[in-house]
Amino acid sequence: MVSQNAPFSLMYDAWKAGSRALLPLDENTAREQVKEMCAKVLSNRKPPYSLKGGLYDALVATGGDMFLATNEEAMEAGALFEKLEGIDIEPAAAVALASLMQCVREGRVEKDAVIMLNITGGGIGRYKKEFNPMRQKPDLVFPVNPDPEMVKTKVRELIGK
């Protein structure tokens, strides 16, 4: 099972269309969609989906499926996890949990099924409230489609080689 956070649904759209190739998505539209989603770490515009041995192949080989969760569904799932487990989770984990909850509601999970769900970021929200960490600016920011040679040069400069 792989989950994406609506409205950024690049892999989900390709999977549901039965396409190994990602469907075209305008860069400006993609940027706007990423701004709207709560789990920004799930916004890879060039994910390892289409390549041989990538997510498409893994889902086909395992009979898997792709799911989509809204921000609201993710927030509800995250709040439920915190209420029941006593710890906050990151938005990406909440998206995965929302997708699992969707599967349960739809009867796609057997009653006695053994489930492993990777929950990340437990306690980060609490930590931020208690310690108020300062956000650092990146030393290096690349354009959307950088020249590979420019990337090599900039990284070498950054690490001093």
Whereabouts are the PLM-identified features?
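Short, structured secondary-structure boundary patches
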Residues: 84-93, 108-114
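Catalytic phosphate/nucleotide-handling subdomain of diverse soluble enzymes
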Residues: 97-160
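Short glycine/serine/threonine-rich phosphate/pyrophosphate-binding segments
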Residues: 1, 10-11, 92-100
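Structural beta-sheet core signal
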Residues: 1-2, 117
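Active-site/ligand-binding loops adjacent to catalytic centers
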Residues: 2-88, 132-161
